[in-house]
Each structure stands twice: as structure tokens, then as C-alpha cells.
């Protein structure tokens, strides 16, 4: 797939796409890049969880010449079953093979939604199994202290009793689910990826 001035080969996809022409990646999709530099993780698509900003962010990262894989979680909507504030409906989770696919990479970029408590609970569960440095992209103004209070290891604030293997190294807020991602936010994600991959 030619993107920008460099060609990237992406092994895509494990299941058939959704929508007209199969343009929307379905849950369980893993599109693997030739080199395992960055993996972008999306919530499962559905009525409230749209993968649109993830597609635009991924395209921007690839255009910057960074080898990027994409994983759409099989159970990416809802909140974890052990979250303090339970909810009816779907339950967020990660399969062992999904964690293994993510851990083959150097850096994870994960897109969450707009409820701070949901972001914190999801990040907590994901990073129990994902061991690589992670950048969170979301709409809500969450910060490292919010994550550390729940036992999530972060670059800036370390919890007294860490519950996670992985560490949040950066956060990009203001990315609205289901809306086009502004170029300034895509640039911010790319800048932070380059910083943590030592590409500057």
C-alpha cells in the first residue's frame, strides 16, 4: 500500500470488513505492518464506538514513515467486569492472543472514549497484559494522576501499589469519537510517538 513517499506492506485483515465495500474494520481485525514499531488499538465498532479517528490517526502515522499495525479489540466496548462501578451491557476485555499481538511491538497507541472512569478502568485492564509503553488517545481530559490513583503505572506519577505491567508514557486528549480527527491532534500523536521511539 503506497502511503506518502514510502511504501508500507500491511497484512490485512483477519475478518471481513463492515459497511458498504467493507470499509469499516470489524472487531477482531489485526492488520500487521512489516515491522513491529507501533500498534494502534481501537475499541470494537458499534453504535457508540466508531473506529473513525483511529483510521485517520493510523494513516497520519504511516504517512510520517512509521511502520504501524492496527488491532480492533474483539471485546472493546463497555467497561471491565471488575470495575468498581459496574454497568449493564457489554463488557470490555482483552484476549491472550490480542495481548500477544500488541506486545510484539515497541509502542502501543490506544484509543478510548469520553468517560474518565471508563478510560481509567479500560487502561487498567489493558495494561495488566500489555507490557510495552502506551500512549492513550481520548476525548476526556484525563491525566496521569487519574490513572495512577487506580494503580496504573505512568511515566510521570508512579502509584504506591502498581496493578499493571505496562506504563502510560503519554496522553493525547480532545480526540472526539466518531468525528474527523483534526490535523493538529494527528501531529501531536506523531510527535509523541517519535519522542518515545527516539526518532527525533
UniProtKB/Swiss-Prot annotation:
Domain of life: Archaea
Gene Ontology BP terms: methanogenesis
InterPro entries named in the record: Me_CoM_Rdtase_prot-C, Me_CoM_Rdtase_prot-C-like
Disulfide bonds, paired cysteine numbers: none
Keywords: Methanogenesis
Record bears the keyword Cytoplasm: no
Record note on quaternary structure: MCR is composed of three subunits: alpha, beta, and gamma. The function of proteins C and D is not known.
Protein name: Methyl-coenzyme M reductase I operon protein C
